[in-house]
UniProtKB/Swiss-Prot annotation:
The lineage of its organism: Eukaryota, Metazoa, Chordata, Craniata, Vertebrata. The chain crosses the membrane at residues 19-38, 62-82, 94-114, 206-229, 239-266, 287-308, 354-380, 441-462. It comes from Homo sapiens. GO terms for biological process: adult behavior; behavioral fear response; blood vessel morphogenesis; brain development; cellular response to ammonium ion; cellular response to bisphenol A; cellular response to cocaine; cellular response to mercury ion. This is Excitatory amino acid transporter 3. One of its GO terms (molecular function) is monoatomic anion channel activity. The keyword Transmembrane applies.
Length: 524
């Protein structure tokens, strides 16, 4: 009787801990089934399709609502909790990891697309174009990226990004003159010369969307400053720490609604698709991208994690399952950030000082899946146009795709803009980006999932590499001096050591019934 009862308790505990994940998986299956059935057996109007997807829209709005307070509070508390030298080392390790994995993803994508050659058997005229090509200048896009790092108005940066647009400067009109043969010739010569040397001016404007890059730069500096202010800055640290905890409580509430929202989100997207024939025409191209994403997420990232951390990477990935599934459904690294935090800290027990610093930066600049996709797409478009790319052009694609994906978050309409930048860098027709837009919505979901997985593995790797610095901070902290159990846990039995341990996962876990070990402190 004891074993069945124990198994029953284990099942109850499993369901209690994973009910959101299980219900989300069920919602995905049910959403796909509902979408296919509604599409086949009912003829919904455009307005009815919009109403049908309304619950999914509410989920997206709730997740986007929580992005801003989450990024601000987590970045400030994460940086303030670290010594400036330690935060510099952690930041450097994170950036090196992001750059290396992104470059590996680009190289993998190029190797696959050159080997499989998905565009050789097709021609440009065989594929229908969708959407329009944005007018992009590589230089202006890079300068806009730097401008957005330093917003002129912090409040405006919460909902708008700065962008520039080129406008042609019209020449002054010539005075009226008699159109003799000589004057006519002079006017035509002047007009031709003016067409050859057009003048442009830069016009600044704002587009809707959170300037995440600018906010991260500000929060990074702000966190460093209040961390150095000592007692004067402690009140601000406590405020943002409380804001971070309150935000995560709201995330838990949103997660309860997530299965219902995802059901209608995925069903509504299936109903919206009008031309499924395009998936057959671009099937080999899609298979190339998905193969690259699968290899990168199942082989390369886990291998890097195992080499550095020496732990089972797939167990770590399973702990991130809810975040990966959310990324797959909503197609946004930033909107998935609340769930990513929760999975990394609660399921995988990653130090909060690492997650609060590394994850917001990773969601902004670590785009492994996007970089791989852009590299494959650029070579695919070259193959469609019967263009043979040389070694120099392939290297250019690698460098441009890596750089463009890192700066994607600071560029308005990032997906199309960065794709056009990569195409323009090697002289490919930018308008051909419209050939692959029709399937981009589906591929975007998978590459977002890879981006989030890369961010998650990054926290585990950076935590391992920063273990010595974090332990030194623990030993030198005031709580460890006040609490003798923190330094003498070896003399306690397992039960007491778990109770008396002073610092666990970036937070202070103490026994409030013990007057010796209990100390009022803020948690980071």
């Amino acid at each position: 009787m004891g074993k069945p009862a124990r198994k029953g308790c284990e099942w109850k505990r499993f369901l209690k801990n994973n009910w959101v994940l299980l219900s989300t998986v069920a919602a995905v299956v049910l959403g796909i089934t509902t979408g296919v059935l509604v599409r086949e057996h009912s003829n919904l109007s455009t307005l009815e399709k919009f109403y049908f997807a309304f619950p999914g829209e509410i989920l997206m709005r709730m997740l986007k609502l929580i992005i801003l307070p989450l990024i601000i509070s987590s970045m400030i508390t994460g940086v303030a909790a670290l010594d400036s030298n330690v935060s510099g080392k952690i930041g450097l390790r994170a950036v090196v990891y992001y750059f290396c994995t992104t470059l590996i993803a680009v190289i993998l994508g190029i190797v696959l697309v050159v080997s499989i050659k998905p565009g050789v058997t097709q021609k440009v005229g065989e594929i229908a174009r969708t959407g329009s090509t944005p007018e992009v200048s590589t230089v202006d896009a890079m300068l806009d990226l730097i401008r957005n790092m330093f917003p002129e108005n912090l409040v405006q940066a919460c909902f708008q990004q700065y962008k520039t647009k080129r406008e042609e400067v019209k020449p002054p009109s010539d005075p009226e003159m008699n159109m003799t043969e000589e004057s006519f010739t002079a006017v035509m010569t002047t007009a031709i010369s003016k067409n050859k040397t057009k003048e442009y001016k830069i016009v600044g404007m704002y587009s809707d969307g959170i300037n995440v890059l600018g906010l991260i730069v500000f929060c990074l500096v702000f966190g460093l400053v209040i961390g150095k202010m000592g007692e004067k800055g402690q009140i601000l640290v406590d405020f943002f720490n409380a804001l971070s905890d309150a935000t995560m409580k709201i995330v838990q509430i949103i997660m309860c609604y997530m299965p219902l929202g995802i059901l209608f989100l995925i069903a509504g997207k299936i109903i919206e698709v009008e031309d499924w024939e395009i998936f057959r025409k671009l099937g080999l191209y899609m298979a190339t991208v998905l193969t690259g994403l699968a290899i990168h997420s199942i082989v390369i990232l886990p291998l890097i994690y195992f080499i550095v951390v020496r732990k089972n990477p797939f167990r770590f990935a399973m702990g991130m399952a809810q975040a990966l599934l959310t990324a797959l459904m909503i197609s946004s690294s930033s909107a998935t950030l609340p769930v990513t935090f929760r999975c990394a800290e609660e399921n995988n027990q990653v130090d909060k000082r690492i997650t609060r610093f590394v994850l917001p930066v990773g969601a902004t600049i670590n785009m492994d899946g996007t970089a791989l996709y852009e590299a494959v797409a650029a070579v695919f478009i070259a193959q469609l146009n019967d263009l043979d790319l040389g070694i120099g052009q392939i290297i250019t694609i690698s460098i441009t795709a890596t750089s463009a994906s890192i700066g994607a978050a600071g560029v308005p309409q990032a997906g199309l803009v960065t794709m056009v930048i990569v195409l323009s860098a090697v002289g490919l027709p930018a308008e051909d980006v419209t050939l692959i837009i029709a399937v981009d919505w589906l591929l975007d979901r998978f590459r977002t999932m890879v981006n989030v997985l890369g961010d998650a593995f990054g926290t585990g790797i950076v935590e391992k590499l920063s273990k010595k610095e974090l332990e030194q901070m623990d030993v030198s902290s005031e709580v460890n001096i006040v609490n003798p159990f923190a330094l003498e846990s070896t003399i306690l039995d397992n039960e007491d050591s778990d109770t008396k341990k002073s610092y666990v996962n970036g937070g202070f876990a103490v026994d409030k019934s013990d007057t010796i070990s209990f100390t009022q402190t803020s948690q980071f």
